[in-house]
Design a protein with these regions (language model features):
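Flexible, glycine-/basic-rich loop-and-beta segments that form/coincide
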Residues: 228-301, 525-526, 531-533
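Short, solvent-exposed loop/turn and secondary-structure capping segments
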Residues: 106, 126-136, 203-205, 231, ...
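Conserved S-adenosyl-L-methionine
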Residues: 61, 133-141, 171, 198-200, ...
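Conserved Class I SAM-dependent methyltransferase catalytic core
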Residues: 150, 157-220, 462, 482-504, ...
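Segments forming glycine/polar-rich beta-alpha architectures that bind adenosine-containing cofactors
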Residues: 105, 109-110, 118, 276-402, ...
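DnaQ-like (DEDDh/DEDDy) 3′-5′ exonuclease domain used for proofreading
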Residues: 1-118, 123-176
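Conserved proline-anchored active-site loop of SAM-dependent methyltransferases
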Residues: 112-130, 207, 434-448, 556
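PRPP-dependent phosphoribosyltransferase catalytic core
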Residues: 450-592
Length: 592
């Protein structure tokens, strides 16, 4: 049966229609014949037209209306497979194309499937680039530019302060991308964005508007320990990383949001070594001396004591933490094990109920003083407290020059892998997907691969990078890279090869592969859908030069199916068909 609306099939998710459907589920009577009854909606929200003339707090700029409208226009592009690297069954993707269009194209297939969006966008310093969107036909504009039909056109341009629209240009680039990418996040998903002082204030306002202030997780300050040399005022030596979750209630329900104490293993190993070689008494003194010399966090430095069993611990108060007094049974005295006399009780009572106190006594987790005059503390063993709250500070003054040199990859000012890992690790669980649509040299993918190697997180990544030409003066160009996306693809491939070589045992358990796609105009003019829900496409319905593989991936995108599903060629009743996802979808071959 031929579709009466072939155009609908060759576009991405219709966001306006999707939003209207969501609205109709909440307020059914506000949607009539597919249109929104604004008056009815205002009544449901407790608003009347009298409010129109009232003054509201609003963050706006020239072009904001067009930026919002651009998010509601579906893309008429698709993705075309270019090459597979490594594991054929990989779930990792590297997509070459304008990230705005790519995010639109992924709306159906990856809606609410991404756990972390992690981006490092242009900071708008006046030297970096800002993407130039053509809201009327962004796909046509992109393809004309990348095929150099107009050699004078550019994918992006330096956003210099003399344009008179310095902040406006940046806002018009960022707002629509941040808006539609939110749809891809899981309910408990998180977005993390690197930024410096140039646009921090504006980014915060955008994020509060799109995500809501109540969903803000906070700002992490990355202290680079190296002040900027070109500053005209205060010399900044830090960047900021803003974190917002999609739904704070879902996030808290499903995420502990704790990070591994980075140096806990070192502390335990040092204590074990000292006890073994110096004895318990000397080990206690030397551990404290050693800890004072280390650049550890405050939470880690608190663990500098060794108990009779050789275990590292810290003392913690057992006093009731609230201003109000604890219940009556929280005032039962603890008896000193030597003097057999009652120890002092905290003024507002103990922190724990009697049953917990009994268990702590039994497990030797209460610390008594020399006699009954000292109030007891609780013993926190380091081995049982290997996680800590995520700090608002990251101290890292190094670079990845050595890592990139080892891989023989060149790129100016990449993110630092170890910093990326500190952001990704406390947020993501096994099998989560990390999306970076300002991929650059693919540092985020590099960090994901190292996390997978180190703790078998089994994370997957989707990298998106516009094929921006590299200037001939740069070292990367001299090494043979013509596009920024070339650098990212080569880097990911080399990191995976390195892991295979250095860690063959774990390599077999990891997803060491990725598939490269690039953005393209649609292959399909019209389509036919059979009664059995399979799809038939005839050569007459196709654009020139497309392959069966191109058609299959476009159908997956239109059906909202994962691009990494297995595809097998089969023969059914003498006809060649493609079995997608082990029977999830059958596509008739156009050569049958």
């Amino acid at each position: 049966m031929k579709s009466k609306e072939p155009k609908e099939f060759v576009s991405s998710l219709n966001i306006i229609r999707d939003n209207i459907e969501k609205l109709s589920k909440v307020f059914p009577d506000t949607v009539k014949d597919g249109a929104v009854d604004v008056t009815s909606l205002l009544h449901h929200l407790g608003l009347t037209n009298d409010h129109d003339e009232e003054e509201f707090y609003n963050f706006t700029w020239k072009g904001k209306k067009e930026a919002i409208q651009s998010t509601q226009e579906p893309s008429e592009g698709t993705l075309r497979k270019v090459k597979n690297y490594g594991d054929k069954t990989t779930k990792n993707l590297f997509i070459e194309g304008d990230n705005f269009e790519v995010i639109k194209i992924l709306q159906k297939s990856y809606q609410e499937k991404i756990k972390l969006i992690y981006i490092d966008p242009p900071y708008n310093t006046g030297k970096d680039f800002v993407y130039k969107d053509n809201y009327k036909d962004n796909i046509k504009n992109y393809l004309e530019t990348t095929t150099q039909k107009d050699k004078k056109s550019k994918l992006s341009s330096a956003n210099i302060d003399t344009t008179g629209r310095f902040h406006t240009n940046w806002l018009n680039m960022m707002y629509p991308r941040l808006s539609i990418s939110r749809n891809l996040l899981k309910a408990d998903g998180v977005i993390a964005i690197h930024i410096d002082e140039h646009e921090y204030a504006n980014l915060e306002k955008i994020m509060n508007e799109l995500y809501g202030e109540n969903n803000r997780l906070g700002t992490i300050v990355w202290d680079k320990r190296n002040p900027k040399g070109d500053s005209k005022g205060i010399a900044y030596q830090h960047e900021s990383i803003l974190l917002y979750c999609k739904d704070i209630h879902e996030f808290k329900k499903k995420n502990a949001f704790k990070r591994v104490k980075e140096n806990a293993g070192k502390i335990i190993a040092k204590a074990n070594e000292l006890v073994k070689t110096k004895g318990l008494s000397m080990a206690r003194k030397e551990l404290k001396a050693w800890m004072r010399k280390q650049d550890f966090s405050g939470g880690e430095k608190a663990y500098q004591l060794i108990d009779e069993k050789g275990k590292v611990y810290r003392p913690v108060s057992m006093a009731w933490p609230n201003k109000k007094q604890a219940p009556d049974d929280y005032f039962i005295p603890l008896v000193h094990p030597v003097t057999k006399k009652a120890c002092p009780i905290p003024a507002r009572g103990w922190r724990n109920p009697p049953a917990t106190m009994e268990r702590l006594l039994k497990d030797d987790l209460i610390l008594f003083g020399a006699d009954e005059t000292t109030q007891p503390n609780r013993k926190y063993l380091l081995e049982e407290n290997m996680f800590e709250n995520v700090s608002s500070m990251i101290y890292y003054g190094g670079s990845d020059d050595a890592k990139l040199k080892e891989l023989d990859v060149s790129f100016d000012t990449p993110k630092v892998v170890d910093v990326c890992k500190k952001i990704i690790e406390p947020i993501c669980q096994p099998h989560d997907i990390v999306l970076d649509f300002f991929a650059g040299s693919a540092t985020t993918a590099h960090a994901v691969l190292e996390l997978n190697q180190g703790n078998q997180k089994q994370l997957n990544f989707i990298m998106v990078q516009i094929p921006e030409p590299i200037a001939k003066k740069h070292e990367a160009y001299k090494k043979g890279y013509q596009l920024i996306s070339d650098v990212g693809i080569d880097r990911v491939n080399k990191v995976q090869q390195k892991i295979r070589k250095e860690d063959p045992e774990n390599a077999d358990k990891m997803d060491l592969g990725f598939t490269v796609f690039k953005i393209s105009s649609s292959n399909i003019k019209s389509w036919s859908q059979n009664e059995d829900d399979s799809i038939s496409i005839t050569p007459q319905n196709l654009n020139e030069h497309c392959t069966e593989e191109d058609i299959i991936y476009e159908i997956l995108l239109q059906r909202g199916l994962d691009l990494t599903l297995p595809i097998k060629e089969e023969t059914i009743k003498g006809k060649k068909v493609f079995n997608v996802g082990d029977g999830l979808l059958y596509i008739n071959s156009m050569n049958s």
